[in-house]
Amino acid sequence: MRMTNVTKGKAAVVLIVEDDREMLSLLCDEFWSAEYRLRQARDGDEAFQMVLQSVPDLILTDLRMPAGGADYISRLRTVAPGCPIIVMTAFGDARCKSDVLKAGANAYFDKPVRVAELKQCVHDLLANTSGDADKAAS
């Protein structure tokens, strides 16, 4: 099992990747708690560099942004194989969802996101610290 902050009894590190300032602010407000330590990135390249430096316990990311897309999810998966990845997008369809899940995402949400469902998904994936729980939501 991958040692994470969760398995060590510490606050989980969640990397939130979002290029829209309002959405980033909303997500940070929703996940701000003693339970999570938040890190932020504004695009796929910045997120990738941050993950190279230190793998978070979970990545919550937009899909359609600079340096985003299914290839971005594949790149993240190669450097963080056990880290749960949740993808959100406002421009998805069934094929997009399939491509993203095949690329290595653990969960997929269409925007606008139902915050309660997103929080439950984050909680569930962090509870399974191996990151192997494939769960898809829409």
Can you say where each PLM-predicted feature lies in the sequence?
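Non-catalytic signal-transmission and effector/linker regions of two-component phosphorelay proteins
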Residues: 1-15, 116-138
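Two-component/phosphorelay signaling modules centered on CheY-like receiver
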Residues: 20-39
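Acidic, metal-coordinating helix/loop segments flanking the phosphotransfer/catalytic sites
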Residues: 40-58
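Short amphipathic alpha-helix used as the core "switch/output" element in two-component signaling
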Residues: 49, 70-81
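Two-component signal transduction core modules
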Residues: 59, 85, 108-109
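The short loop immediately C-terminal to the conserved phospho-acceptor aspartate in CheY-like receiver
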Residues: 59, 63-66, 91
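Alpha4 helix (beta4-alpha4-beta5 surface) of REC/receiver domains from two-component response regulators
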Residues: 71, 92-109, 120
